[in-house]
């Protein structure tokens, strides 16, 4: 395995952990309408769970309103049920051709709870990044034992791995801080 290949793979995995964090935080509502709130909603469509965003257009006509317009009107009631069954805490209003979702204002207590959830998701991402670093370090140590690197090269690679980890953790912290700010300010 080439020297940089280990670090490159670790950096790619760290980037994926950051992307997962951003996706997961996108589904946490912050008092404003955001189409990503519905990303985790699946509708039973002819016996198969289908993501809502593949069955309907989701628009934001007003700052706190989501409008879900199904491509096939026959599934309107199924979509309404799926939204009710999700843990969004938003009641859908079915007008016969589309579903309106009014995102309620968040109470101070709810905002604090959501901020805790944001921190917890951030911590999970940091743990994932640290596990990736540990795996990369283990691979480097094995390669060093096999004589693939001299001690100077090994220490340089260890430092590069730690630098990559520090950068990834910093990005995770920034993502979490931005989402916390969004949630707390609403």
Swiss-Prot record:
Belongs to the RRF family. This is Ribosome-recycling factor. It is found in: Cytoplasm. The keyword Cytoplasm applies. Responsible for the release of ribosomes from messenger RNA at the termination of protein biosynthesis. May increase the efficiency of translation by recycling ribosomes from one round of translation to another. GO terms for cellular component: cytoplasm. Keywords: Cytoplasm, Protein biosynthesis. GO terms for molecular function: ribosomal large subunit binding. It holds the Pfam family RRF. GO terms for biological process: translational termination. PANTHER family: MITOCHONDRIAL RIBOSOME RECYCLING FACTOR PSEUDO 1, RIBOSOME RECYCLING FACTOR. It comes from the Bacteria.
């Amino acid at each position: 395995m080439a020297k940089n290949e280990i670090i490159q793979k670790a950096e790619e995995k760290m980037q994926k952990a950051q992307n997962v964090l951003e996706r997961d935080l996108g589904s946490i509502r912050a008092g404003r309408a955001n189409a990503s709130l519905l990303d985790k909603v699946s509708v039973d469509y002819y016996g198969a769970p289908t993501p809502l965003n593949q069955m309907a257009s989701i628009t934001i006509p007003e700052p706190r309103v989501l409008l879900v317009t199904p491509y096939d009107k026959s599934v309107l009631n199924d979509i309404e049920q799926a939204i009710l069954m999700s843990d969004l805490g938003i009641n859908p209003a079915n007008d016969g051709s589309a579903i309106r979702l009014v995102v309620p204002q968040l109470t101070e207590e709810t905002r604090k709870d959501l901020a805790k959830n944001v921190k917890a998701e951030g911590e999970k991402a940091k743990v994932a990044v640290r596990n990736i670093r540990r795996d990369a370090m283990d691979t480097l140590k094995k390669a060093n034992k096999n004589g693939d690197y001299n001690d100077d090269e090994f220490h340089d690679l260890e430092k590069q791995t730690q630098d990559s980890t520090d950068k990834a953790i910093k990005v995770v912290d920034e993502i979490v801080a931005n989402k916390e700010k969004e949630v707390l300010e609403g």
